[in-house]
Each structure stands twice: as structure tokens, then as C-alpha cells.
Amino acid sequence: MEIIKKTDGLTSADLYALTKGNDVRKMADAKGEVLEIKKFVLYNDEDVNGNPMTVLAVETVNGAKYATNSKTFTRNFSDIVSIYEAGNEALPSRFIVGSGKSKSNREYLTCDIAS
């Protein structure tokens, strides 16, 4: 496992809970919801077949943990983090878990800043 980016101050216990914890749910379970995120980690790992994948795991202010390997959601979230870092601004805490349909009618997850 290789950590790409994470919330400042994340402890080893936090990293374990977000990347290996049994209570981490699928981000798709939060589709349509606004999540108030207090911790995140973006990391590279391998799937069960040994193929590389990038995973985003988050923890909300009420302790719920979600993870996804959705390329669109991860790209959206990473772009938000990069833009706010470049502007030396604090990262927003509220994010909308949205969805869309591809041309081949497959559903995918999206991430946006909640107002």
C-alpha cells in the first residue's frame, strides 16, 4: 500500500481504521447524501487479483467510514483538494456523493462541494 495524500495529523491507528477496518462501507451506500468529512486518505493498493487500484477512504464527523475506487469520484475529490491547497485555503468539510450514467448506461459516483 502506498499513501498518495491524507489529512494532516492522521495517526497510524487512523490509517489502519480507514484502510483495513471492518466497518468501512462502500461510498455507493452514501449516494445522494451530504457527508461532513473530517479525515481522508487516498492510496494505491491491489485488488484480490493483484491488479493496482487507487482507493479513497473518508471518515465523517459522526464516525462513519466510506471507501471507493470510483475513478470519477476520486478524481473529483482530488481536484477539490488540489485547488484548495493551491489557494492556501482550508478544505471544505461537506461533500455531496452524487451519481451519473455513462454512455454505456453504467452508473458512476461523483463528488462535489456541498453548500
Regions found by a protein language model. Give the residues of each.
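OB-fold ssDNA-binding interfaces and closely related basic DNA-contact patches used
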Residues: M1-G63, S104, I113-S115
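Compact, Lys/Arg-rich rRNA/RNP-binding cores from ribosome-related proteins
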Residues: T72
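A short macromolecule-binding patch
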Residues: A64-N69
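Short nucleic-acid-contacting surface segments enriched for D/E, G, S/T with interspersed K/R
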Residues: A30, R75-I96
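Short, charged beta-turn/beta-strand-edge "cap" motif at the junction between a beta-strand
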Residues: G87, F95-S115
